[in-house]
């Protein structure tokens, strides 16, 4: 098939060299080959299921199949991987639209119970990026392990309002950089653009909804109830060329600590 196990091993080895001990399989169910290699190499996994529930993000998304297939797909996922030692936790969603509706917590409860019935031993989380909404509709309170995508400055407020005693940075940073490109003056910027369509490797640039690595580290170090973070991302990937959404020829992300060729950026060494 299309899976190249040598490529998987190389990527995991690079992440281990950076110091990572866990990979989140965003935002879909991982290939069996990936999980097997993670088992062999000692890399832990947060196995994720869905990027969309019943409310659509896109016209041709999983919402078309959610009602009929969500329980079946989630059941198959957990049964398939629950005996793999690399699986550390489960994720039932990522930035779903149900975060902002009144019954969103009910859908989360439904999916979480499916997982819990099949595997009562592992934590279950959900990547939530709208803290105010999920605190209001109780989706955050419903989760076994609260996972917040971004706003680390919301952690303390959320902790005071939630029954759980732990918080996870389920998706963090989204710092922007291009390997070997350095922009002056060196200053923190949001959504900075340049004629060469690159981002500075000084790691001082981010999106208007994200932040720099040290912003997360401050909270991870100072708040005893935070248990770690999944940075976005380990590697650059095709698509989402923020902040150059429509400028040709940009077509890959700038988020990675490692570029598309597998070569470390400066941020790789910062994390290490």
Locations of regions flagged by a protein language model:
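Extended substrate-binding grooves/exosites of carbohydrate-active enzymes
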Residues: 1-272
């Amino acid at each position: 098939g299309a899976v190249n196990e040598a490529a998987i091993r190389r990527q995991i080895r690079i992440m281990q060299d950076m110091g990572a001990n866990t990979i989140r399989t965003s935002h879909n169910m991982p290939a069996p080959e990936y999980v097997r290699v993670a088992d062999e190499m000692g890399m832990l996994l947060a196995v994720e299921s869905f990027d969309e529930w019943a409310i659509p993000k896109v016209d041709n998304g999983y919402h078309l199949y959610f009602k009929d297939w969500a329980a079946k797909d989630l059941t198959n996922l957990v049964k398939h991987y629950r005996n793999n030692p690399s699986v550390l936790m489960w994720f039932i969603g990522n930035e779903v639209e149900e975060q902002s509706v009144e019954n969103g917590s009910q859908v989360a409860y439904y999916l979480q119970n499916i997982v819990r019935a099949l595997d009562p031993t592992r934590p279950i989380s959900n990547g939530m990026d709208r803290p105010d909404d999920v605190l209001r509709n109780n989706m955050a309170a419903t989760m076994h392990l609260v996972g917040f995508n971004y706003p680390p400055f919301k952690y303390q407020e959320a902790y005071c309002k939630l029954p759980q005693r732990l918080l996870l940075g389920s998706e963090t940073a989204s710092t922007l950089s291009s390997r070997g490109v350095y922009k002056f003056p060196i200053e923190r910027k949001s959504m900075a653009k340049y004629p060469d369509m690159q981002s500075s490797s000084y790691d001082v640039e981010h999106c208007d909804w994200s932040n720099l690595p040290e912003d997360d580290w401050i909270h991870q170090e100072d708040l005893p109830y935070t248990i770690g973070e999944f940075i976005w991302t380990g590697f650059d990937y095709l698509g989402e060329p923020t902040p150059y959404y429509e400028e040709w020829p940009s077509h890959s992300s700038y988020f990675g600590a490692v570029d598309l060729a597998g070569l470390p950026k400066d941020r790789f060494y910062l994390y290490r």
